[in-house]
Regions:
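Catalytic active-site module of serine/aspartate enzymes centered on a nucleophile-bearing elbow/loop
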Residues: 267-270, 275-299
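Catalytic histidine neighborhood in serine/cysteine hydrolases
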Residues: 255-270
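Conserved alpha/beta-hydrolase "acid-adjacent" motif
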Residues: 242-247
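Glycine-rich nucleophile elbow surrounding the catalytic serine of serine-hydrolase chemistry
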Residues: 9, 190-203
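Serine-hydrolase catalytic machinery in alpha/beta-hydrolase-like enzymes
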Residues: 92-182, 270-275, 279
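PRPP-dependent phosphoribosyltransferase catalytic core
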Residues: 21-86
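Short beta-strand/loop motif that positions the catalytic acidic residue
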Residues: 229, 235-237
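Alpha/beta-hydrolase fold nucleophile elbow
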Residues: 180-193
Length: 299
């Protein structure tokens, strides 16, 4: 993309560079360019788009009413608003099984948030998907993941095996590190119920994890690993979820990382009350953007 073409030399160089970096499809888009130059670019690009294609052009600026400079940030904002997130069903090898997940990456993602749900839930949970959509809108990638296979979910011992769940979460994190589109993105965890304990335990063993959010979680089940966690951690609990709230207060006192405990008034364990899940999603988005964008994961 350019503000216009004259000789087209810089666009040819850009197209060739994109090919050298492995681009499978190169599209050139300009508001104006000489017809002959556009035809020549057809040999370098898969598609060439132009609003105006005069036979000759002396200066690009003559085709503009206002040829003032446009900041790169403004261009990125426009492209980001217009682009759709990529969505992919994935399979991750871990502990001799294959875990199924849904990976969504918005353009210019700030990082990838891996979801660890609790017992009785799944990656298809409407609550998890609602939070994921809010994170995607905030330029955060999401991996909704089932940490157990369908057969394992019937085994209550595995459902509450925090060590196993944490190991699976760590395997998914390593898998993201091998993908071209996620390898350079920082990682964060969003855990619910027992999934929060798995997220904290996995983060305790991996200082590269930048941030954690627990929704109605059981961080107490992470035990002694709580004091080892370095990632900034946000604990969100419903004000009417009395037992879990007390467990979170106890867990918060064991954390040595930067952390906050936020209570959502009127909310019960599943945040089913009107507007309460939206509050969780907004808090999570702000927490992740703050710590992923700042690059200050461990403190």
């Amino acid at each position: 993309m350019d503000d216009g073409l004259a000789t087209g030399a810089t666009m040819v160089a850009a197209a060739r560079w994109a090919r050298s970096r492995g681009a499978s499809r190169v599209v050139v888009a300009v508001p104006v360019g000489p017809a002959a130059t556009l035809r020549a670019l057809g040999r370098e690009a898969d598609d060439v788009l132009a609003v105006e294609a005069p036979e000759t052009i002396f200066a690009v600026g003559e085709w503009y009413g206002d040829f003032g400079e446009v900041a790169e940030a403004e261009v990125e904002a426009v492209l980001g608003a217009a682009a759709e997130p990529s969505e992919e069903r994935v399979s991750i090898a871990a502990d001799g099984v294959h875990l199924v997940g849904d990976l969504t990456l918005p353009p210019a993602a700030l990082g990838t948030v891996v979801f660890a749900h609790g017992s009785g839930s799944s990656r298809r949970s409407p609550r998890n998907r609602a939070v994921a959509r809010r994170l995607n809108a905030a330029s955060l990638g999401t991996l909704l993941l089932d940490l157990l296979t369908p057969g394992e979910e019937a085994d209550r011992a595995r459902v509450f095996d925090i060590e196993l769940l944490a190991d699976r979460l760590s395997a998914a994190t390593r898998w993201l590190g091998f993908r071209l589109d996620t390898a350079t993105l920082p990682i964060a965890y969003f855990g619910a119920s027992t999934g929060a304990a798995a997220a904290l335990r996995a983060a305790a063993a991996d200082p590269s994890v930048r941030a954690i959010v627990s929704r109605g979680g059981r961080p107490d089940l992470a035990g002694d690993h709580l004091s080892v966690v370095r990632a900034p951690t946000l604990l969100v609990v419903g004000g009417r979820d009395d037992v879990v709230l007390e467990l979170n207060r106890g867990a918060a006192s064991a954390l040595r990382c930067p952390h906050e405990l936020v209570v959502i008034p009127g909310a019960t364990h599943l945040f089913e009350e009107a507007g309460t899940l939206d509050q969780v999603a907004d808090l999570a988005a702000a927490w992740f953007r703050r710590h992923l964008a700042a690059g200050d994961g461990a403190a």
